[in-house]
């Protein structure tokens, strides 16, 4: 992991009082001078670990169009009175939208499953609608994008709402049944699951402020809903964990963290209001997950909920802003909230306050489970504020990782402009602009900024040479290509891809030849793998030249009968610093081998000496610029090593690394690799 954050040098233009009038330290409201922040590590791909989850997020009702649920019924009487209607028409433009996600370069996509489509009436199951989500998952995986599925994101069937929804505990089983059936359908391919999105927002907006369906103002009903949502989450988590694939899936709750700061920090009434709202909106929910006892907002006592304690494998954090509190805060959402004089007001009227994301992490750290930023974005119609908003929040996230917070990923809200609940279409959060008349999507400048940061941290395409005959392995490669020979229970190709994915690779190109038809059914659960077969043996160089149309501008080159578990980040750093056309990994301890190097550059290559077991000098992992293939390639049979290495003497860079290089080219070496992998697994 190579992370470079210089947050210790940041200066603060404002830092308010540490404590309220009674002298008890509560929290610091930090305000940073962002003009002093160094964003270079972000831009250069040095701010986040290689396995960091880069994502974008959406919700079904906001983008799909054509839904009939509690929200579509509520919309005519909502504050904006705008109807979701066709929304972004994602239901009919799914494949194109997956292409938009791919173009951003992200590794993950969070979406929600529309319960009302799949169970439009009690006891009815729409398999065609369920299959639509299964097809979405397959399309995402084919592009190397890992799905994260949310089972409840504000919407629910009208028939269930009419029965009282989450107000009645006896209704919970309907949602759990829906969840388990969708889990059974998708969990063989979907690793990440969110049970309920923002239960505090659902409860507050629907049952306290009346801005969401059912549009009531009742603390009593809100308490029932809050309690039953936590019971539903616990029941759902335990049910899913008991199912096939349950133990290998990561299942968690998504909590919106809304910070509350006293408007006047010397005023005890302002502090009282901040503490009260923080307790009701944040602390009671987090404490419930930690202890298993939940005290709903405005309740006097807590109640033990079976299965609640430890019912999240991760905590999803949705963070947008902080609110400044007074005893007379308005309860109408459309009234502008208070802001500090130096803060920027977003289109949603609240301030941009990136510094608060760190406090959100601190608030959930005590759960002792991984943290994922499942939503972070800004309403900004002109896209003037969003680029800086992205940089600031990613900077805060990177600093927290450096300081020891276990933060696994960041999902930008949202992929595209969409139907923003009570605000209708007046608030735009997307990286893609949507013309709601034509449904045309256009990448915004902020989308380019996010994509640039993501791609700077992304690993290049992995290219695997798997076309050789493997004759040294004898009988076993007469009927099985060498890259599909099983080692420790799975093909060596799978081991190679597993390691590459752990290093941050998303896409692989496998060059096949001998028995190439046997690769047709091969799939990897986390990487998009494509195959290119040579009609006749072309040698290592000829195979690359033959596949030149499928090579990306830069790629990592490995051999399909070797396992070389090096740190790709360190190899890439050497390559980028040297600005070389090719950088190869070489062990540090060697003298008179086929490959000689001096001062970090390849000196000569002469394939005459007998290769020493497991040295890997001729075929070590390399990073290659596609231009090398285009400038030196030719038709016919030729060797990459013997041709290119010699021609790049004095130009190719050397990356020194003593990581063992496992060559399974002979039965004896295969046995050594088998033993190594068994020991690694144990």
Model-based region annotation:
Residues 2-78, 102, 122, 131-386, ...:
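Active-site region of glycoside hydrolase catalytic domains
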Residues 72-100, 104:
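Aromatic- and Gly/Pro-rich amphipathic surface segment
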Residues 93-114, 310, 314:
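Catalytic domains of carbohydrate-active enzymes, especially glycoside hydrolases
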Residues 199, 376, 469, 561-562:
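Active-site metal-binding loops of divalent metal-dependent hydrolases
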Residues 459-464, 486, 490-570, 633, ...:
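Conserved N-terminal catalytic core of the sugar/cofactor nucleotidyltransferase
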Residues 459-478:
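N-terminal nucleotide-binding beta1-loop-alpha1 segment
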Residues 555-556, 563, 569-576, 589-591, ...:
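Catalytic-core segments of class I nucleotidyltransferases/pyrophosphorylases
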Residues 578-588:
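A short, conserved acidic/glycine-rich loop-to-beta-strand motif
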């Amino acid at each position: 992991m190579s992370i470079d954050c210089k947050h210790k040098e940041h200066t603060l233009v404002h830092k308010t009082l540490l404590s309220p009038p009674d002298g008890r330290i509560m929290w610091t409201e930090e305000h940073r001078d962002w003009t002093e922040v160094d964003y270079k590590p972000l831009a250069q791909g040095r701010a986040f670990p290689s396995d960091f989850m880069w994502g974008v997020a959406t919700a079904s009702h906001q983008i799909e169009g054509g839904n009939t649920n509690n929200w579509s019924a509520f919309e005519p009487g909502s504050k904006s009175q705008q109807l979701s209607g066709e929304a972004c028409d994602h239901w009919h433009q799914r494949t194109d939208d997956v292409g938009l996600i791919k173009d951003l370069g992200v590794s993950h996509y969070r979406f929600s499953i529309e319960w009302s489509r799949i169970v439009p009436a009690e006891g009815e199951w729409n398999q065609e609608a369920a299959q639509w989500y299964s097809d979405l998952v397959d399309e995402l995986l084919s592009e190397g994008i890992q799905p994260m599925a949310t089972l409840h994101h504000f919407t629910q069937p009208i028939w269930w709402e009419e029965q009282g929804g989450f107000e009645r505990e006896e209704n919970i089983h309907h949602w759990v049944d829906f969840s388990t059936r969708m889990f059974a359908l998708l969990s063989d391919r979907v690793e990440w699951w969110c049970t309920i999105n923002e239960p505090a927002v659902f409860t507050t907006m629907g049952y306290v402020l009346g801005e969401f369906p059912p549009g009531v103002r009742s603390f009593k009903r809100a308490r029932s809903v809050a309690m039953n949502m936590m019971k539903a989450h616990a029941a759902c988590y335990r049910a899913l964990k008991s199912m096939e694939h349950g133990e290998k899936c990561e299942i968690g709750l998504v909590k919106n963290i809304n910070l509350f700061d006293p408007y006047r920090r010397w005023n005890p009434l302002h502090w009282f209001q901040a503490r009260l709202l923080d307790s009701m909106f944040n602390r009671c929910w987090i404490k419930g997950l930690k202890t298993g006892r939940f005290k709903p907002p405005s309740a006097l006592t807590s109640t033990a909920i079976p299965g609640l304690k430890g019912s999240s494998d991760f905590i999803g954090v949705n963070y947008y802003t902080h609110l400044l509190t007074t005893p007379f805060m308005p309860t109408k959402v459309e009234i502008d909230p208070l802001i500090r004089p130096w803060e920027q007001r977003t289109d949603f009227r609240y301030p941009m306050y990136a510094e608060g994301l760190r406090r959100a992490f601190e608030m959930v750290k005590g759960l002792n489970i991984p943290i994922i930023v499942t939503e972070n974005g800004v309403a900004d119609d002109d896209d003037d504020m969003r680029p800086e908003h992205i940089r600031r929040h990613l900077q805060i996230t990177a600093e927290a990782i450096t300081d020891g917070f276990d933060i696994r990923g960041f999902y930008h809200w949202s992929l595209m402009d969409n139907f923003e609940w009570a605000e209708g279409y007046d608030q735009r959060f997307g990286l893609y602009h949507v013309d709601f008349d034509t449904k045309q999507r256009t990448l915004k400048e902020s989308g380019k900024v996010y994509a640039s940061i993501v791609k700077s941290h992304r690993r290049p395409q992995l290219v695997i040479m798997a076309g050789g005959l493997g004759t040294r392995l004898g009988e076993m490669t007469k009927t099985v290509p060498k890259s599909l020979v099983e080692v420790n229970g799975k093909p060596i190709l799978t081991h190679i891809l597993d390691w590459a994915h752990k290093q941050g690779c998303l896409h692989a190109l496998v060059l096949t030849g001998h028995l190439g038809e046997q690769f047709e059914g091969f799939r990897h659960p986390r990487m998009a793998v494509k195959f290119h077969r040579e009609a006749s043996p072309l040698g290592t160089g000829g195979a690359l030249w033959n596949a030149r149309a499928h090579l990306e501008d830069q790629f990592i080159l490995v051999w399909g009968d070797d396992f070389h578990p090096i740190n790709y980040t360190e190899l890439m750093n050497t390559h980028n610093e040297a600005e070389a056309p090719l950088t190869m990994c070489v062990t540090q301890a060697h003298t008179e081998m086929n490959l000689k190097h001096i001062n970090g550059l390849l000196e000569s290559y002469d394939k005459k000496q007998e290769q020493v077991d497991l040295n890997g000098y001729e075929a070590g992992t390399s990073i290659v610029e596609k231009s090398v293939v285009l400038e030196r390639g030719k038709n016919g049979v030729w060797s990459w090593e013997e041709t290119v290495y010699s021609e790049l003497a004095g130009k190719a860079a050397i990356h020194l690394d003593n990581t063992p290089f496992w060559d399974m080219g002979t039965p004896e070496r295969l046995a050594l690799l088998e033993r190594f992998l068994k020991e690694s697994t144990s």
